[in-house]
Amino acid sequence: MKKKAFDYEKLLLFLLCIGFSFLFYGKTIAVENVNYGVEQLHQYNHELFKQNIGLMEDGFSPRYYANVIVSVLMNLLKMSWAGVATLIIRANFIIYAVAAARMVCKVTKERRLLFGAILVSCMFRSSLGTLAGFGLNGAMDVFIGTGTALVLLGISFLIGEKKNWMAAWICLSLATLMHVHEGMWGGCAVGVIWLTVMIAGKKIDWKTLKGLPVYVVVMLLVTVPALLHGEAVDETLFAEIYVNIRTPNHLLPTAWGTDVIVKSFLLLLIPALFFAIRYWKDRSETKSRQYLILSILSMALWLLIFAVQYFGTILHPSSTIITMYLPKCFKYMAYFAMLLYLKIADLLFDEERYLQSAFAILVLLLGCDYSFAVTMLCAVLL
């Protein structure tokens, strides 16, 4: 039996993505880490910050397991919190890079190196927008970045012909341990892919759900103790403080700006139109049908998240909806859009429609800009 030749191009792709990722590495630890750092240091030494308002005196933090990891690493490696945080941040960049390299291998066979550089750049710049202030680039945040990176890695196991659902569920479970919101909304993103595959195949493959119980158990371990120790709050007062005063940029839809909201949805709509036209012209294009389904489901989830967030913060304030941080899901829909634009560029290049392929890449690189979005729309319709 002939041995399969070693794929040096794939190795080069992984090295390129890792090297390119670290071009976006910051020289300082993000200030957001200080909030979680209080919990992590308190886990390391319970005598620290005992009266800090950020600690749950009688409750259970959803970040408990992540805090334990930091504490264990500090003891094991004999390092300061800053040293351990730096190691985790560097690991985040590597996981991001591996996720990007794996994804590019699934999207194209001919233009891996080019697409690898493009995807890494777009991920770390959040090129398709940061609706509600949540972008894909969280690598400089301890554990938020780890959770996001693990979700992206999990998604990379589900694109293309060969899918590894167990690996994806494990990545989601680990992401949940790192940060509950990333695990939760990453799970919704994986759910979109699962529905896409099931609808396209016109049947439910129960084998794909073998790893789901692991994910559910981890989610329960993280969320149930915190919910059991919850206290009754005045919903209106909570919304006023938490949404309107503390984080309107993240949680209040009316603070995001109509312009940003429209652009965000438009960037999801264009790939859907492209694959709809492609499938309408040739019904044998099964791949186009799958990408069309993915586009439609992504838009449907986007609209659902926006509607629920609007209802739960403005029309009928709900502390449950507010603390779930639903808008974090938008960044995963933006990631799907990135992959769809890469696929569009790849298909158009194969068909020697180089100008249109370039437009797709320009939209991907420049993101939320009406002029390029409209140009791409015209290119799609030609």
Question: Where is each model-derived feature located?
Answer:
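Transmembrane helical bundles and short interhelical boundary loops of multi-pass, membrane-embedded
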Residues: 297, 305-311, 317, 325-326, ...
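Membrane-interface transmembrane helices that cradle and orient dolichyl/undecaprenyl
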Residues: 146-167, 200-203, 349
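Hydrophobic transmembrane alpha-helices of multi-pass, membrane-embedded glycosylation machinery
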Residues: 170, 174-176, 184-198, 273, ...
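Active-site lumenal/periplasmic loops and adjacent helix-entry segments of GT-C-fold
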Residues: 6-10, 18-120, 131-147, 177-182
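Membrane-embedded alpha-helical segments of multi-pass membrane proteins
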Residues: 88-95, 142-153, 187-188, 268-269, ...
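Transmembrane catalytic cores of multi-pass membrane glycosyltransferases
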Residues: 21-37, 41-64, 180-186, 198-338
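Membrane-interfacial loop-to-transmembrane alpha-helix junctions, especially the N-terminal start
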Residues: 9-10, 110-116, 164-165, 207-212, ...
